[in-house]
Amino acid sequence: MSNPSRRDFLKSTVSKAFSAGLGVCAGAELFATSTASSAVLATPPPSPSPIKKGLVFDMLPSKLSYVERMKLARDVGFEVLQAPTTPDEHAAEEMKKAADAANIRIDSVMNMDHWKYPLSSSDAAVVEKSLAGMRTSLHNAKLWGSDAVLLVPAVVNPQTSYRDAWSRSQTQIRKLLPLAEELKIVIAIEEVWNKFLLSPLEMAKYIGEFQSPWIQAWFDVGNVVLYGYPQDWIRTLGKGIAKVHLKDFKRKKDGFAWVNLGDGDVDWEAVRQAFRETGYSGSAICELDGGDEVYLRDVSRRVDRLVLGQS
């Protein structure tokens, strides 16, 4: 697979303490009690999280140049970026140069045509436009050194049934597999509010039917809060998750709101634990409102605390 290798978190083991003055356990410090007749072992600090912290390119101030935006992302603590599909070849080259200059990786591509031109459409012309957009996204990914392209696979609506969305989209995605394999780019299926793949079991089944390492999941933490639990999705999809989007969601009496990380209903401690259990070591990319340096630095610190478990 082209996505980064999974690294297991370090598991620390603690042996029973010896009597006062008798030896210490490896990896822990032995402290004598006030009676000097027993000892207590200090718990080693958790190992650093292997998850890479990122954000979508559109969160950065548009008034800045490509290089300035990417340097800002790096300066406030982000390691990777997700960039949008860029059909203009010159602009795509400039994005690459800017990322190199800023020493930040364009980790993945946000495909831009799947909502306007869904692969599940019954209109062949619409589907071809969608396929063309994905091909551009895959080539962008290769140019930028990315390893995944996000894809919304289908849209269920009055014209497209759930069954048709399933079969049509799989048929079209299979047409993209040879290119994805050639370029070694994962097509990462995201769960969104498209009335499709409404449970982690369905999503796992849908992806599993491709029987290809080049089709994996892009899991969005905030998107499932209305009807599910992110930690459940993470455990169910497990090693099939290639990338992650970070959002937070808050229920309100008069509806709902997308809010900053930690200000909504996501149980971040449970999410963090689920990532640990599954050994997730990919990217966690913020998909939030944009803002200035002060705001972005605050978002970066929230990721440190809520997702990476750093104080």
Segments from the language model and where they lie:
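Histidine-acidic metal/acid-base catalytic patches
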Residues: 2-34, 38-54, 59, 63-74, ...
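Active-site acidic/histidine proton-transfer and metal-coordination neighborhood
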Residues: 13-23, 27, 120-219, 226, ...
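N-terminal small/glycine-rich loop or linker at the start of catalytic domains
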Residues: 44-56, 108-119, 156
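Active-site-proximal loop/turn and secondary-structure-junction residues that shape catalytic pockets
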Residues: 59-61, 87, 112-115, 155-157, ...
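A structural motif
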Residues: 78, 141, 146, 241, ...
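Glycine-rich, proline-tolerant flexible connector loops at the mouths of alpha/beta enzymes
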Residues: 83-99, 153-160
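Short amphipathic alpha-helices and their capping/turn segments at secondary-structure boundaries
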Residues: 90-103, 133-143, 229-239, 273
